[in-house]
Swiss-Prot record:
InterPro entries: G_ENGA, GTP-bd, GTPase_Der, KH_dom-like, KH_dom-like_a/b, P-loop_NTPase, Small_GTP-bd
Domain KH-like, first and last residues per copy: 353-438
BP terms from Gene Ontology: ribosome biogenesis
Function description: GTPase that plays an essential role in the late steps of ribosome biogenesis.
Residues bound to GTP 2: 183-190, 230-234, 295-298
MF terms (GO), sorted A to Z: GTP binding; ribosome binding
HAMAP family listed in its UniProt record: GTPase_Der
Pfam families: KH_dom-like (PF14714), MMR_HSR1 (PF01926)
UniProt similarity note: Belongs to the TRAFAC class TrmE-Era-EngA-EngB-Septin-like GTPase superfamily. EngA (Der) GTPase family.
Gene source species: Crocosphaera subtropica (strain ATCC 51142 / BH68) (Cyanothece sp. (strain ATCC 51142))
Domain EngA-type G residues, every copy: 4-169, 177-352
UniProt protein name: GTPase Der
Amino acid sequence: MALPIVAIIGRPNVGKSTLVNRLAKDRQAIVHDQPGITRDRTYRPAFWCDRDFQVVDTGGLVFDDDTEFLPLIREQAMAALTEASAAIFVVDGQLGPTAGDREISDWLRRQKVPVLLAVNKCESPEMGLIQAAEFWELGLGEPYPISGIHGSGTGELLDQLITYLPSPDELPDREEINVSIIGRPNVGKSSLLNAFLGEQRAIVSPISGTTRDAIDTVVERGDNTYRLIDTAGIRRKKNVNYGAEFFSINRAFKAIRRADVVLLVIDAIDGVTDQDIKLADRIIDEGRAAIIVVNKWDAVEKDSYTIYDYKQKVMDRLYFMEWADIIFVSAMSGKRVENIFELVDVAVEEHRRRVNTSVVNEVLEEAVKWHSPPTTKQGKQGRIYYGTQVSSQPPTIALFVNDPKRFNDNYRRYIERQFREQIGFPGTPIRLLWRGKKTRDVEPSLNRATKV
């Protein structure tokens, strides 16, 4: 469902992200005692009474300073307003009206979006009314005293807010496919997001660490709705300092868990690095479908064999993800970017796919016929009784055997390859659970391939 959008606007460090966390009933927006933590516009689902909507956290607005990312942050805030049904202008009740507040309120009065004035940091109900009264001078109507930390006063604010939102009957009902964009810093994740959208939703800069939050953006292609999640670049743990970057990386890992499909973005110039391999490991650990996106392909000198050779190099390093499709794109030019959606659709379908028990056992019967289970040094042979798919997302097949310990890694890889060859499952990992027939104990194994 395409939910109505509410933009959260205000100066740096007035508590916008704290209010977003309060409204969204989570702590996904990064809150840190440092101005400028939020840079891109980030989307969070929220609700009040019987109304669902999205709150959009934006960077702190400063009109009289063009250093660093501030002009780009202004663009993001303006873009958020253009798609919003309403806006909440957050000010600091402890400081009182500032020149920056007056400048933003003058700008907001020229917009065609209804604006509610939230006076934050009013921790005392009695003092809050006095603090809020000072903000009548901004000319934006009634100031609502609130506490983003404790939640006081937000009920009255939200009661008024939902009067500006479209009714649920006016909203299309569609299932969303969650797609997380993951990669090292500066491989082009935000550029890829912007290429999907045809606009600059995420701030793009040659400086590593530009993206801080996991940015949610909803787009539609054909009959499908996709929630694209851009994330902070993930560096080696020893290079990460505690603070905003630490929280950003945690958000990125959570974004992998939220995803139906993960786009693992690799820099075509650098190739597959050790950090890329660790990210691929994380994707498999979480059981997510995945597509390997080789970005900056326009910067590579090519001949008729380049793609084949490069693909082989990628697979040599990411051999345990041989099931994932690889696509070569240029986010800057947009070349082949739209083709990613076709691969996403296939990966999602396979990730959710269920196979009849009869089909599973036909594959097992044929596999055992061609290659019998191994025999131990004591002369005891492994035996597979039957198999059945027990879950999806990722597809998980339980194999009931006489003794899981009698099946070595080579044979387990062989059985997985047979399922891949006979059934498919492109774009998604599969898990095989080897269960003893008597004990029915599940051996904790992801059945990950190892290089032979």
